[in-house]
């Protein structure tokens, strides 16, 4: 988690010439909103940087990283910035030599199979069918149907919302004055805003972080002028019927084998405090909790004064007492540990690695050794994932390959202090101390089946909340925060399980009554089977 400051606020690009122009404008007339925001950002940045400079532990490298953060934390990029170029790299390890030499994952074009939300349209041949003679005059064979058809993908754009204006014909009697209006067709529906409108607004707002004013502007430019208050009301009315799905996700998450979680700061303008929270605690947070249970992943978000460990404890209250403690992956902050429930605590190896990344420019060779050593461990974990190993097989694989590597790193860290090669209070000394102090929790993956290496999945989940904070700045009250938590939880759970969140939200609204009666049958991974079963029963009846 980053400390409060400019790094956690929306970045605004502004140059010295613009600031000078804003000052001149302020002498003549009141500033416009855009100019005011730029000037306010510049003043806040100056104040924050001044506070940092007054602290003796602040380094120029840390200040440069804060104001101009690196685009990547990959080892090669970090070492290159420290002056260690590709030509100086050590020989490839066994883990890296086995990797594919092709394009990096995620690059290149997608095949037709990747378009899971596309409509499939079978196209028969215009002049041939299976069994017909071959059109080639020099051939006497017959054509047959191939298993794989030819594929042509056509992609079209569409507006987030669409509207149909039904102009109902009206007839008036010239004698008695009665007016007779045509009835709306069945497809017009009974409600002005159908389920798909609410789903799309929620998906853009809480799934993609689009603020209300920007969403309103986009729709208005496309000819659908929907006020912010109306859209907010639509989403609020949708949230209540979907609450049983969130409650069921929490219940099914409680027996999970592994839980990842982290916190980020959030602002709620009007927040009534929980009775069990100390009055001295003034912060407001959003906790992102990702549970892994039987190959399923459940994302839960909690916004309020409670820390991640306290929110985790609320879910663990529903955990069956006969189950063993879950594996808990988080950073090393004490507030992340639930007070009243036992867990197998693992700390994030990426956090330990990040401490060395920050001081690489000052200690290039020492940090190079640590970064490449940890890179080797991650290489072995990638191999285990590629091979599809079970948790027990993965544990033995890591013990055989990563165990000696981590032991070598531990010996090296201890030698830096024992031989007085590193000053304990230096940046490198603090990074080494962090590793040694949390060594048992950082290496749980060498002792417990299924223990992860890092907390990256929770940090990625929190990006939804961070995106909301950067674009919308705050929630108005607790109800707004809870509504955001609900939709973020449902949407991100769908994404983690490769389910279409738009379709899922639509079906939950259409079957709100069934959802309330049997929420366990309307979860992202089984609602399709429930729909098929319900449809079959209705058809049979």
Residue ranges and their predicted role:
Residues 1-189, 260-261, 330, 406:
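Short, flexible loop/hinge motifs at secondary-structure junctions
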């Amino acid at each position: 988690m980053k400390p409060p400051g400019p790094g956690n606020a929306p970045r605004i690009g502004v140059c010295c010439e613009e600031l000078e122009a804003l000052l001149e404008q302020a002498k003549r007339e009141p500033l416009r909103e855009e100019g005011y925001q730029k000037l306010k950002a510049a003043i806040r940045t100056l104040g924050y940087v001044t506070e940092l400079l007054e602290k003796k532990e602040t380094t120029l490298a840390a200040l440069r990283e804060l104001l101009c953060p690196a685009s990547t934390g990959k080892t090669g990029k970090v070492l290159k910035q420290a002056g260690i170029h590709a030509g100086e790299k050590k020989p490839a390890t066994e883990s890296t030599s086995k990797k594919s030499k092709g394009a990096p994952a995620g690059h290149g074009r997608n095949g037709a199979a990747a378009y899971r939300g596309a409509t499939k349209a079978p196209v028969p041949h215009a002049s041939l069918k299976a069994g017909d003679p071959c059109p080639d005059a020099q051939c006497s064979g017959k054509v047959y149907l191939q298993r794989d058809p030819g594929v042509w993908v056509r992609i079209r754009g569409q507006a987030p919302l669409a509207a149909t204006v039904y102009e109902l014909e009206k007839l008036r009697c010239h004698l008695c004055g009665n007016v007779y209006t045509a009835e709306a067709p069945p497809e017009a529906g009974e409600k002005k805003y159908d389920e798909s409108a609410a789903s799309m607004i929620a998906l853009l707002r809480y799934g993609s972080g689009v603020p209300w004013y920007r969403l309103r502007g986009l729709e208005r430019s496309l000819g659908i002028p929907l006020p912010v208050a109306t859209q907010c009301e639509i989403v609020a009315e949708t949230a209540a019927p979907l609450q049983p799905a969130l409650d069921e996700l929490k219940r099914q998450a409680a027996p999970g084998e592994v839980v990842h979680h982290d916190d980020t700061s959030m602002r709620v303008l009007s927040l009534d405090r929980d009775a069990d929270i100390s009055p001295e605690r003034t912060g407001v947070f959003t906790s992102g909790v990702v549970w892994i249970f039987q190959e399923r992943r459940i994302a839960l978000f909690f916004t309020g004064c409670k820390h991640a460990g306290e929110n985790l404890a609320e879910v663990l209250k529903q955990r069956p007492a006969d189950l063993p403690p879950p594996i808990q992956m988080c950073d090393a902050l004490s507030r992340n540990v639930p007070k009243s429930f036992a867990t197998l605590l693992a700390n994030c190896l990426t956090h330990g690695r990040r401490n060395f990344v920050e001081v690489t420019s000052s200690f290039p060779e020492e940090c190079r050794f640590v970064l490449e050593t940890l890179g080797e461990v991650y290489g072995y974990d990638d191999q285990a994932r590629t091979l599809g190993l079970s948790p027990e097989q993965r544990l033995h694989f890591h013990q055989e390959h990563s165990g000696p590597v981590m032991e070598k790193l531990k010996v090296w860290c201890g030698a830096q202090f024992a031989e007085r090669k590193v000053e304990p209070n230096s940046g490198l000394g603090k990074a080494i101390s962090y590793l040694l102090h949390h060594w048992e929790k950082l290496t749980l993956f060498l002792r417990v089946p299924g223990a992860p290496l890092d907390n990256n999945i929770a940090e990625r989940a929190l990006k939804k909340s961070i995106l909301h904070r950067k674009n919308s700045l705050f929630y108005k009250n607790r109800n707004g925060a809870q509504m955001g938590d609900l939709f973020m939880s449902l949407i991100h759970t769908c994404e983690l399980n490769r389910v279409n969140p738009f379709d899922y939200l639509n079906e939950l609204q259409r079957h709100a009554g069934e959802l309330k009666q049997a929420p366990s049958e309307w979860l992202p991974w089984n609602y399709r089977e429930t729909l098929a079963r319900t449809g079959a029963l209705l058809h049979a009846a």
